[in-house]
From Swiss-Prot:
Record field: transmembrane: 26-46, 84-104, 167-187, 212-232, 256-276
Protein localization: Endoplasmic reticulum membrane
Protein name from the UniProt record: Polyprenal reductase
One family name in Pfam for this protein: Steroid_dh
Membership in a protein family: Belongs to the steroid 5-alpha reductase family. Polyprenal reductase subfamily.
Disulfide bonds: none
């Protein structure tokens, strides 16, 4: 029997194209709406919320301490599982970076299976347009790949997770979806990855002043985030032996912690801003930045409140996530 003229993927692609359904935009738009809605509830009316919502939203140092909901507890996994989606992010980002560099080097359109995948995720072949040149894409992909690589290293070989710390399964799943979508968004509107387009040649001479500036800002934020994370790691280590002495959350001092309760979250926002502004013509990257900024801000506010309630001597000049402001 001959195979059907249209395969399942082609039917799906035509459906998405016909109704202008952009799966990437839907994903991150949903993330933004969810974090803003529940984050607002947690910030302003948390005491009136059922324990199931409070328990689902909170984790880590500001995890819910009241009477737990059995069903929500059943849906929790160890916080150390963060390392799983950073392992995925490492593989996925390097794969995309390799495909991008190969396409630019060979000066030919991406393979058909890549184009079809991007058509499905990015709104259909007739709605995907070239908005990003190859040099910008290489810079942005390099940034995100570098960040994924360092976070993989930290979560798998450096970070000390409390054995008692849990996260809701939804947080765990969102980690995978975030990196899955963000990496795809690097290519979805890039020359050579849109049908009928050819990648442009890459050259360091073609780097613009904006790209050079953002590379510098990104590297500084990248390095400072690592330094901030190491301060948190060292709080749980014996300074003489280097062995783990506690799994408690202690008061961090030094570096950007002298200004902020969560400098690592502030720096995450800075790094994503650098990528998103380079990709400014692409709507999906504006959504990704808004998602990251809102998520990190809500988490930082909850963390800041926990520090203030836990440590009487907590410095009054520290802000939650934006130096001197918030």
């Amino acid at each position: 029997m001959a195979p059907p003229e249209n395969g399942i993927l082609e039917v799906l692609e035509n459906l998405l194209d016909r109704y202008k359904i952009n799966l990437l935009q839907m994903m991150f738009g949903t993330f933004i709406a969810t974090i803003v809605f529940f984050g607002g509830l947690m910030t302003f009316v948390e005491k009136y919320l059922p324990n199931s919502i409070r328990q689902s939203f909170r984790y880590g140092k500001h995890s819910f301490k009241g009477e737990t909901d059995p069903l929500v507890a059943w849906l929790e996994v160890p916080k150390s599982w963060f390392k799983h989606f950073y392992t995925f992010a490492l593989f996925w980002s390097w794969l995309a970076f390799y495909v991008l560099v190969s396409t630019v080097r060979e000066q030919k359109e991406a393979p058909e299976y890549v184009l079809q995948f991007l058509d499905i995720m990015g709104g259909g072949r007739s709605h995907r347009k070239v908005e990003i040149d190859s040099t910008t894409a290489c810079v942005g992909a390099f940034m995100l790949t570098l960040q994924c690589t360092r976070r993989f290293y930290e979560t798998n070989f450096v970070q000390i997770f409390s054995k008692k710390s849990k996260i809701n399964l939804s947080h765990y799943a969102v980690g995978y979806v975030h990196y899955f979508g963000a990496v795809i968004a690097l290519l979805s509107n890039t020359s050579g990855f849109v049908r009928g387009s050819k990648p442009m040649e890459f050259s360091l001479d073609k780097l613009t002043s904006q790209q050079i500036l953002y590379l510098g800002v990104f590297f500084l934020a990248w390095q400072q985030q690592y330094a901030s994370n190491m301060i948190l790691v060292n709080l749980r280590k014996d300074p003489r032996t280097g062995s783990v002495k506690t799994e408690k959350h202690l008061l961090p001092k030094g570096g950007l912690f002298n200004l902020l309760s969560s400098p690592h979250m502030f720096l995450e926002v800075v790094m994503y801003f650098c990528i998103a502004d380079l990709y400014m013509p692409v709507r999906i990257w504006r959504l990704i930045f808004l998602w990251v900024a809102s998520n990190q801000t809500i988490n930082a506010l909850l963390t800041h409140k926990w520090y203030q309630e836990t440590f009487r001597e907590y410095p009054k000049n520290r802000r939650a996530i934006i130096p001197f402001l918030l």
